[in-house]
Amino acid sequence: MDLSALETEGRNTRTTELDRLTVPELLAVMNDEDRTVASAVRDVLDQIGAAVELITESLRRGGRLIYLGAGTSGRIGLLDAVECPPTFGTTPDQVVGLLSGGPGAFVTAVEGAEDQPERAADDLDAIGVSADDTVVGLAASGRTPYVVGGLQHARGAGAATVSIACNRDALVSRYADVAIEVLTGPEVLTGSTRLKAGTAEKMVCNMLSTASMVRLGKVYGNLMVDVRATNGKLVDRVRRIVVESTGAEPETAEQALAAADGHAKTAIVMLAAGCSADEAARRIERAGGDIRTAIGAG
């Protein structure tokens, strides 16, 4: 596989003397390069939005968001997946991260795993990929065999497919219903796509999961109302969320949370609509999780 023509593998003309720079100079040039990433992501907001629609529809019908990748790209997808349960109250199987070489490859690289497209098919089959799911393949180069094979297999299973790459005309784009190509250009350190490309992939994943969860009613204003108080930090956060959402006194918020089994959304509906925890839960279910609809559904 010839990668020499890829922009992410090219030499950055602004950093050819990287080893001669002072530490302040080196950090400044890295920061300057990083500042270009947000602009590159902004250029593909339409494609990101289209992917959000696919993901939201999958989650609404009981399907999953499945990230698929190798190396840094796979780790970024896995990182976003594992953050969804504590942030949005999802179950661990609603947002899934598949990493070539398995979970152990997050810490220790599994040599050659990314070059085996059949591994992705096996990994997807192991979790029962179906037409209800959206599979997001991450590959900075746009050519990783594991990701190409995974997207092909997901399509064959009827799943919606999204690709994220950092080169134009990426191979993975051919197998995606929505192709996201964030053109981050040559890296500060030649070929080290854990830098700008990795940052871009993380930004896109942040958008995909967060925007989808907002659409699903897991956010009220800008507050994480589906979070459950499972540790000391979250107990305090959930109490503050209820207070800020309703204007209730902290003691009143605590009483509502106790009745709501620590669930912020239920406590908010209880206080805002003046109803019991059971009635709040019923309202939320009838409203499909949308808190504003639940409050007004008297």
Curated annotation (Swiss-Prot):
This protein's record includes keyword Lyase: yes
Residue stretches making up the SIS domain: 55-218
Active site per UniProt: 83 (proton donor), 114
Keywords in alphabetical order: Carbohydrate metabolism, Lyase
Pathway: Amino-sugar metabolism; N-acetylmuramate degradation
Enzyme Commission numbers on file: 4.2.1.126
UniProt key word Lyase: yes
Pfam families: GKRP_SIS_N
Family, per entry: Belongs to the GCKR-like family. MurNAc-6-P etherase subfamily.
Entry protein name: N-acetylmuramic acid 6-phosphate etherase
